[in-house]
Structures are given as structure tokens and as C-alpha cells.
Amino acid sequence: MKIIIPATSANIGPGFDSVGVALSKYLTIEVFEETDEWVIEHNLEHVPSDKNNLLIKTALKIEKGLQPHRIRMISDIPLARGLGSSSSVIVAGIELANQLAGLNMTADEKLLKATEIEGHPDNVAPAIFGNLVISSYVNKRVQAVVTEFPEASFVAFIPNYPLRTVESRGVLPSQMGYKKAVAASAIANVAVASLMAGDLEKAGKAIQSDMFHEPFRQLLVKEFCPIKQTAQELGAYATYLSGAGPTVMVLAPKDREDAIVLALEELNLDGTVHRLQVDTKGIAIV
């Protein structure tokens, strides 16, 4: 059995801790024979290979008495880069328990459990459902709206250095004034409504007008400004920080993708440029 979970790009500008999209990088969990102890085969650095692996810790939170197995973990989702690497493991752990214990969990049940573990739904929701998901987690209740993402190219610049979420959250203000919060919320509303209406020109302007987190976090990612300027000159809809960063995401018309990829590569920044597509499946069992 294989469990396949997509990468995710959260926030998308002003949709802070609420909006995310599933993208075409993947975590694959392959389950083999039963064993006396959990064995996790992988080639990831600083990741446990036993029951202390986040995958197994998550699965055991769902079903304590799971029979251990030998498992192979393969991922092309880079760690601590703002592409939902930990969220993909959490969702995979929930699905592992669901499959091994025959729990028949609904997608909404998986979402609630994943959100309780992760603390917010912006990454785990699209990892479960695929597509674009707008969600909330208030008073221990999670709500999610799944919709298609308008046709566009995602060009990701993934730096060669990590940025831990705890570090990127540390630069955020502890509070926001009422008038500013109203304005920031209005911008987020327009961004989401424009995406759902398929108006990427209007969505792009709202995405780049975020007031919740990007003005503070962009300072941690030196590549952001040159990428944004280059992408804008070539007709991109928007440039935003994926999740907490440091990955910089360019949202562009399909016919501008090649030019943007070439231009970003010619900047010779410390990282790699990737073409990504929206994943429409979410959790996949093979």
C-alpha cells in the first residue's frame, strides 16, 4: 500500500493561517510487512527512523494499538521551506492509522484531527482535499471550503537554506490595531473572492497587498524583492511567500511561465527554480 500526500502552499498573501493550495511535490509512504517495532526507511537528515518519527507519533495519536510495520518514506517536499513538509507527514500519519486500523474516517474527521495536531488548517486542508481550500479553526471547530484554483502557473524559488516556522512567527507583531485589522481582512476577502471568481488580475493585486504577515517576513528572505521585481516586469499576477517562507512563489499566466523561469534562473540566487501545478486529488491511496 502507498499513501501519497501533496505539498502545499499556504497563506497566498493575506489568507494568513486560512488559505492554502495543494501542489505537485509529494510525500510517498509505502507500507510493507508487519514487524515487532516500527522501522521507517528514508534518506532524510535528522529524521527519526523509529516510533519517534512524526509519521508514527501522529498515527499512534489516532489509534494507539497499531501493529508496527516496515515503512519506506520518500519525499521531494523540502524540509522547512514553506511547502508543508510537516503537514504532509501529519496527514500521512492520520491516513496510515485510518488504513491499518480500518477506521473509515471521513475527510472532515481527518481534517479536524490534523488541525488539532498542526494548530491551524491552512496546510493540512489542501493536503487532504487537494485544490484550493479556505478554512478556519475557531473554538476547536474547523470549517473548510474546497474550490478549484484558476488556471495559472506556479513558479517556486526554493532557497538552499531553511526557515523554521518558529523563527518566522517571531518577527510578527503581537497585536494589530482595529482599523488596520479591518483593512487587512478586507484585502483578504477580495483575494479569496477574486480567486474563486477566476479573476487573477484582481487576486494578484490583493495577494501582494497583505498586511498580516508578509511585510514582516519578507525581511527574512533576501531573494524576495529581486524575484518580485523580475516577475512583475514579465507580467506575473503576484509574488508571495509560500507559508512562513523562505520559498518565494510566483503566480503567473501560463504563457509567461517559460520567460519567468528563465529570468529567475539568470538571477543566480542561492536556490532552485521549480515549475509546479495544482494537485487536485489530495490524499491518494495506491
UniProtKB/Swiss-Prot annotation:
Gene3D superfamilies: 3.30.230.10, GHMP kinase, C-terminal domain. Transmembrane segments: none annotated. It comes from the Bacteria. One of its GO terms (molecular function) is homoserine kinase activity. Signal peptide: none annotated. GO terms for cellular component: cytoplasm. It catalyses: L-homoserine + ATP = O-phospho-L-homoserine + ADP + H(+). Its main location: cytoplasm. Keywords: Amino-acid biosynthesis, ATP-binding, Cytoplasm, Kinase, Nucleotide-binding, Threonine biosynthesis, Transferase. Pfam families: GHMP_kinases_C, GHMP_kinases_N. It is an enzyme of class 2 (transferase). Its EC number is 2.7.1.39. Pathway: Amino-acid biosynthesis; L-threonine biosynthesis; L-threonine from L-aspartate: step 4/5. ATP binds at residues 78-88. GO terms for biological process: threonine biosynthetic process. InterPro entries: GHMP_kinase_C_dom, GHMP_kinase_C_sf, GHMP_kinase_N_dom, GHMP_knse_ATP-bd_CS, Homoserine_kinase, Ribosomal_Su5_D2-typ_SF, Ribsml_uS5_D2-typ_fold_subgr. It is found in: Cytoplasm. SUPFAM superfamilies: GHMP Kinase, C-terminal domain (SSF55060), Ribosomal protein S5 domain 2-like (SSF54211). Catalyzes the ATP-dependent phosphorylation of L-homoserine to L-homoserine phosphate. Belongs to the GHMP kinase family. Homoserine kinase subfamily. This is Homoserine kinase. It comes from Streptococcus suis (strain 05ZYH33).
